[in-house]
Each structure stands twice: as C-alpha cells, then as structure tokens.
Swiss-Prot record:
CDD domains: MFS_MelB_like. One of its GO terms (molecular function) is solute:monoatomic cation symporter activity. It holds the Pfam family MFS_2. GO terms for cellular component: plasma membrane. It comes from Lactiplantibacillus pentosus. This is Isoprimeverose transporter. Involved in the metabolism of isoprimeverose. Transports isoprimeverose into the cell. Transport is driven by the proton motive force generated by malolactic fermentation. Cannot transport D-xylose. Induction: Expression is negatively regulated by XylR and is subject to CcpA-dependent catabolite repression. PANTHER family: MAJOR FACILITATOR SUPERFAMILY (MFS) PROFILE DOMAIN-CONTAINING PROTEIN, MAJOR FACILITATOR SUPERFAMILY DOMAIN-CONTAINING PROTEIN. Disruption phenotype: XylP-xylQ double mutant retains the ability to ferment xylose but is impaired in its ability to ferment isoprimeverose.
Length: 479
C-alpha cells in the first residue's frame, strides 16, 4: 500500500539541509509555544474522556461498570489498527504543509464533534445507549489518534538537535499537564454549575464537553498555522512502502522498551485517574476532594520544567527512572494517609507522586524521537510516522486495558452506583487507585534498566549527520 497526497502551491517545502546546519538552528519561541499548545488542546477534551467517562457512563448515562470495562477493552482492539494506520498515513503524506501538520487541519473538527457526542445522553433504550456509547467512544478514540500522533511524529522534523527536542517536549508536556489539570479541576464544578448543582446532570456534562471541544478545535488550527517541518532528509521526501517502514522497527530495542513503558505506565495511571471520584466519594466520604486532588497535577509542572536540566546532567534514562521511583513512594504515602482518613498525608503523597510522573511524561516523546534516529542508524530506514504512531497506540492501549481492569475490579468487588459500598467494593476502589499504579510504575522502572541509548547517542548522531550529508550531496549531483 502506498498513499501519496501531493499538493503544490506557493508555500514552499523546507529545503533539505545537512544535519550540521540543522543543529545550529533553534526552534523560535513562538513556534515552541504553538507546538506545546497541541498537547494542551488534546488534554482539554481527551482528559475529560479519560478521567470522567467511566463515572459519566455508570452514574449519569446509566450503564454498568462491567459493560463499560468491556467497551474499553473492545476499543483497544480497534486501537491495535488505528495507531499504526495513522502512522502509515503520515509516512505516505506529502503536502505543501509537510507530513504531520495537515492532520491538525483535517481532523480538528471531527475530533471536536465526537468529543461532545461522548457526553451526550440520547433518549434511547438501554441497549441502544450501549450501541451509542460504542460508536461515540471508539469514534473519539480513533480521531484522537489522528490529532495526537502528529504531535510526536512531527518532533523529529522540528529539529534534529537532541537538547532542543528535550526543550520542545518539556514545554509541550508543561502545557499538556496544564490542560489536564485545568479540566480535572474545573470539570465537576462546571458540571454542577450548568446542571443546577448536580455533578450527575446530563446537561451539565454536555455543556462542559461542548465548551472544551470548541476551545480545543480552535487551538489545533493555531498549532497548524504556526509550526514548520524543517528537518527533511532525502528519504523523508519519498513515500516509503509499508514493508520498508516496518524495517525501522527491526532490532530497535530502545523503541520496544519505550513502547512497553508507555503501555504499562498509562495502564496504571488510568486505573488511578478513573476511580479518583469514586475513591473520594466512597472511601474518603467527600467527593469534593476529588477536584482538589486532581488539581495538584500542577506540581508536576515543576518536574517538567527541570527535566531538561536533569536529563542533561544525569541522562534521560536516569531522570525517568527517578520519576518512576518517586511515583511509587508517593502512592505508598497516599495509601498510608487513606487508611487513617488523613487528607494532609494523602495530599503529600499525591504531590510526591505527581512530581515523579512529571519527569516521566516529559521524556517519553523525546525517547521515541531518539528511537526514530536509532531505527535509521541501525536499519537505514527513517519512518517517523510508523515508529511514533505506536506511542499513541501503546498509551491508549494501556489506558484502555486500565479502563477494562478498573471496570472488572469494580464489578468483582460488587460496586453499585450511588449506594453505600460494601467493604469488598471499597477494597476494589483502593486496588485501582493505589496498587495497580504501583505495579505499573515498578515494571516500567525495571524496563528502564535495559535502555542504553544515552550512552551511544553521540556516535549515533554523528553517523547520521555524515549519512545525511552524503545523501544530500548525491541528490544535488543528480539535479
């Protein structure tokens, strides 16, 4: 399969330049900020889905936790195809705007529409509501990939400077965390505002989803208009056959490790995120604490800000490893506080945990960009789309499995919406909120011990610089 989308106009494509030239060019601050807004926009809408959709489905929409868990699992099967599909499409896209940028232009509106439909309660039978949930949730999931995968796939094309990539990813993660924090903090109060004081109001959830979707849509257009794909190799200008693209993954162990970490990390994060409201409503007897605790995500910004500094001094691998260990410690402190119903201790544990996850989230995209370079260095094939598309796939797959695990654990514990919960149900909520994330962070930390790219990066980049210079010289001779 080879799909080539060729467009020609007065907007010239960036000239192919030797890597030595690219290394001297820093991305302007205006473009850094515009790029960072992409994750801000994604999180405004999709964090509403990932954080609150299970609660919406069980306590507002009116379907069981077991059905929701199954839905999330089925959606992950679809993700097994949609992530790589969008990656292949990006690798075979050639427009006057570049390879990744146009997807924000093309899919901002469809993503916004389905984001709203997810939080719409139609006047249907229970069976038809389940069908509606499947169509709208899987739809928003697929369209999220269409606007999210380009955020990662464009990074190797924005700059080839590894430190500049860390800076770009850090700013992006800062804004992404800010977006997630904003929606996590204000969602329930806004729902209550539009819903006449109730957080279970269907109209309230619809209005919040609509507002966030429109804001996100406008931001995607801004991101499209203010970013530029400036790093283009001779190879990147050609449509690479799928079979050739897949060669970029052969023996690409850094990619395998990062994809595994992305999967297991987000699995744990999702189980915690989706039961936050449940945990404080039923285990801590105060649902209003959920917004406060979710708002503490802001402290992750401190870790995000200093990530470039720590990565430069102790390496990307060690910085992420430190983050995983902090996240585990935070969870344990939180658990101790919950047993004593001690909110200050829970707050401390949450802050420590968010500091840890701030280090992690800021580096995943950078390490994936490095795996693009590694794939080209090892196999001679540069395929940003297919390599980075698995970032979205693995994260969403982890979140989906996490959602399924959450639903199954709640169901096994005998959770009944809007009722006093049994001891078994409370333990099920605690399992999701505390222990599943600890397992995810621990397995990720173990996987990081096998990540060695930091040590070979100088030689790898020097070899690629020489390779690109030779390819460009040959291309000039053939003109």
């Amino acid at each position: 399969m080879s799909v080539s989308m060729q467009h020609h106009s007065s907007e010239a494509s960036p000239a192919t330049q030797p890597a030595s030239v690219i290394h001297k060019n820093m991305v302007p601050w205006s473009e850094r900020f515009s790029y960072s807004l992409s994750d801000f926009a994604c999180n405004l809408s999709f964090s509403l889905v990932s954080t609150y959709l299970m609660f919406f489905y069980t306590d507002v929409f009116g379907i069981s936790a077991a059905i929701v868990g199954t839905l999330f699992l089925v959606a992950r099967i679809v993700d097994a195809f949609d992530g790589p599909f969008w990656g292949i499409m990006i690798d075979h896209t050639h427009t006057r705007w570049g390879k990744s940028r146009p997807y924000w232009l093309w899919f901002a509106i469809p993503f916004a529409v389905f984001s709203v439909l997810c939080f719409t309660v139609p006047n249907m039978s229970t069976g038809m509501k389940v069908v509606w949930a499947y169509v709208t949730y899987i739809g928003v999931d697929v369209l999220y990939s269409a606007v999210n995968i380009p955020i990662t796939s464009i990074l190797p094309s924005l700059t080839s400077n590894p430190q500049e990539r860390v800076t770009l990813s850090t700013i992006r993660q800062f804004m992404g965390t800010l977006g997630a924090t904003i929606i996590s903090t204000i969602a329930l109060p806004l729902v209550a505002y539009f819903g006449g004081g109730s957080t279970s109001s269907a109209h309230g959830w619809f209005m919040v989803a609509l507002i966030m979707a429109v804001i996100a849509m406008v931001i995607f257009f801004i991101v499209f208009a203010n970013t530029k794909e400036r790093v283009q190799t001779v190879q990147s200008k050609k449509s690479i056959p799928i079979k050739t693209s897949l060669k970029a993954l052969k023996r690409n162990w850094p990619w395998v490790i990062v994809i595994f970490i992305n999967f297991i990390y987000w699995l744990g994060m999702q189980t915690r995120s989706q039961v936050t409201v449940y945990f404080f409503k039923y285990n801590m007897h105060d649902a209003t604490l959920a917004s406060f605790i979710l708002g503490l995500q802001l402290v992750a910004l401190l870790a995000v800000v200093i990530t470039p500094w720590t990565a430069k001094r102790i390496g990307k691998r060690n910085t992420m490893l430190m983050g995983m260990l902090l996240a585990i410690v935070g969870q344990l402190i939180l658990w101790g506080g919950s047993k004593a119903l001690n909110v200050p201790t829970i707050t401390v544990g949450t802050i420590v945990g968010y500091l840890g996850t701030g280090f992690v989230s800021g580096l995943i995209a950078v390490m994936l960009a490095d795996s693009v370079d590694y794939g080209e260095w090892k196999n001679g094939v540069r395929a940003e789309g297919i390599v980075t598309s698995f970032s979205s796939f693995s994260a969403k797959f982890g979140m989906g499995i996490g959602g399924a695990v959450t639903g199954l654990i709640l169901s096994a514990g005998g959770y009944v919406a809007n009722h006093a919960q049994s001891a078994q149900a409370l333990n099920a909520i605690e399992m999701n909120y505390v222990w599943v994330p600890i397992v995810g962070f621990g397995l990720s930390a173990i996987a990081l011990l096998f990540y060695k790219v930091d040590k070979i990066e100088p030689k790898m980049l020097a070899d690629l610089e020489q390779k690109h210079a030779q390819e460009n010289a040959l291309a000039d001779d053939q003109k």
